[in-house]
Amino acid sequence: MSSSNYNINNGGDYYPLSSSNLNSTSAITNATVMEYSTMPSSSPGSMSSSPAYPAAYQAPSPCYVADPNQLYYQQQLAHNGNDMLVQAHAQAYQAQCFAWFQQQYSQLSPSSFPHPMVAHHAGFIPPPPSFLHHQHQQHPRAPSEKRRGARTPFSDSQLYALRTRFEQCDTIKVDERRKLGAVIGLSPEQIKIWFQNRRFKLRKEKYKQIKQDAVQQQKSAKEEAEEDQKHVIS
């Protein structure tokens, strides 16, 4: 055993305890157990005072009452995490707690839970559709999140008419959009969006071409400067 251990105060915090005072650890632990065992049900942390919680929440749990041996092994585990015996004891204690919770929750009906999602997580019972719909209404779509509509498939004849008109002028008025739409079978809004996208595409291609030309000019100027420098040296 190491030269120092840890003890637990009433607040649940760990503080160091010297090896000379190890005999007082069990006395403090027993006092803690008695304090939790005799705690009245009307305490702020007790759920038995709330009528919304079923009887299974009020049943005694091996995880709520502190065990002196368990507290001792927790102290040893916090001080020496490589001890296989201490780790095995802690894992067995966790399995015991899980088995108790599973047994208590399996005996309850879905209507006895204070909240639908508690029953869903405890007994793997799907929540009612009304609850899911209510949860969806509490988180509406943000104004910035715009839903994108489906792309309109254009036929070859429609694209030919649109491109021919765009080559004449990249803008089109409302009256002309209506007339053209009646001929090729498109709405004025669809024609407007197509012209906007076409103008944006051309501007993007033009900017890309200008950037490529600038890079090419810089490269050509650098090559010419290097050639001139070679001629001067020679």
Curated annotation (Swiss-Prot):
Key words, A-Z: Developmental protein, DNA-binding, Homeobox, Nucleus
Gene Ontology biological process terms, A to Z: cell differentiation; mesodermal cell fate specification; muscle cell fate specification; nematode pharyngeal muscle development; nematode pharynx development; regulation of transcription by RNA polymerase II
Keyword DNA-binding: yes
Transmembrane segments: none
Record's GO cellular component terms: nucleus
Cystine bridges: none
Stored Pfam families: Homeodomain
DNA-binding region as annotated in the record: 147-206
Superkingdom assignment: Eukaryota
Amino acid composition bias (Basic and acidic residues), ranges on this chain: 220-234
Traits of the deletion mutant: RNAi-mediated knockdown on an hlh-1 mutant background causes embryos to become paralyzed and arrested at the 2-fold stage.
Region (Disordered): 128-154, 209-234
GO molecular function: DNA-binding transcription factor activity, RNA polymerase II-specific; RNA polymerase II cis-regulatory region sequence-specific DNA binding
Subcellular location: Nucleus
Family per record: Belongs to the NK-2 homeobox family.
Main function: Required for mesoderm development, including specification of muscle and coelomocyte precursors.
Protein name: Homeobox protein ceh-51
